[in-house]
């Protein structure tokens, strides 16, 4: 007696077993076998990034230099993350340090005043090259991180006795970080970064700028930290998984599309120029046999002579009877020729829609909105514009916290150590820890950059006032959203109030009345919109 055969249940494709088909499709061949030829290797970040690291960054550099959309993406990062002034808001951890809150506030005011004098000096003493203020260095760092995936800053010491502070910083291009003598990567030296067995960076190999190529390339090893804990070389990037040594630039996911879009735009422009260049064409009759003789016999001297003679006859005829469109005379054409007027044609042919689709894809990869990347705000309502701005704002705030603020805080700590040693600022006497014992606690701070873009100024102010009145926010947070320091605003308001009183001016009561009127009008509009909905 034969054992009955149990039929195998198959999936929708009729080939894959149902048991296999019920699993994750991404690891299989896919419906109809679409994924069968897609077999990428499983690699670590360094294995995927470092072999073509130099070429990838060079391509990103070329995009930023020669592609308008790429340059705009970098500009958006600089303007929305940093802005025109990257303001320090020093807030030491006074509870941990064992000092009073008022002592901490007094110390912070002293530190902020000294820091601003040092960092934003027009003489650019903070920069080794004497080209940048502190805000300019942060803007450069954000741009460097965007199109190179990382930023480097070297903390140096000025030996000149003419300045109060000797601390200086040098912006270092990621192109200069490489293995000495351009050797291959090893377990403890990858792409110019010396690491220990745990993957922590110990130092960096920095090559000298050899332009214009008249001197041999040399490398200098710079430690990450000095023995006392002071930062010597600042390296900021966002790793995506463990074991990553260098940063990946933001253009990797959209680099191919951006290059092809650039080529497409140039081709479209050339096509439009060609179509607009020729207003009239003269078509000459040539029988098939003669045409094939000219084409196939192009290497024959006899055929070349025949072709030259034929073209010469045409040129001689039209030299005697030139074709002109601006004159009143209607010319006689050579027998067999026809005069065709070329009308202007639509050069778009669906190009704009295709370009928008590509730009939306590119904007998603770069973390900005399509409207910001393309500078096209047409056909947008307030709600759409606000949602788009909020999405980009969340991305920019993450970059401000983990890129710009990290660079700024490490630079600030280097300066604060010297300021304390030189007694430019004085630590509170009752502090539990010294600066060397609690660097992070003494240097704890926030950084205020550019404010959030206001779509409707009145509604945004009303929202801020309501949040403060409801206890859901503070003046500090709302002013920071606008790129301002609430303490500076309060101090300025006190000065202005005293000056108005001294001048015999009344408080601007009309401002409060106008605000209440606008608030009532906005509420009525929202109620009418809800009724209509």
Segments from the language model and where they lie:
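N-terminal-proximal low-complexity accessory segments that begin disordered
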Residues: 1-102, 531-533
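Activation/maturation switch segments at domain boundaries
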Residues: 2-4, 337-348, 390, 458-533
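Charge-rich, acidic-biased intrinsically disordered regions
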Residues: 39, 132-138, 155-172, 287-300, ...
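Structured, mid-chain assembly/scaffold modules that mediate subunit interfaces
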Residues: 76-239, 467
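A broad, structural surface signal
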Residues: 109-120, 132, 139-147, 151-154, ...
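Surface-exposed loop-to-helix/strand elements on domain peripheries
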Residues: 122, 128, 328-455, 516
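Intrinsically disordered or highly flexible coil/loop and linker segments, enriched in small
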Residues: 124, 147, 151, 242, ...
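Extended, charged amphipathic alpha-helical segments
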Residues: 233-388, 431
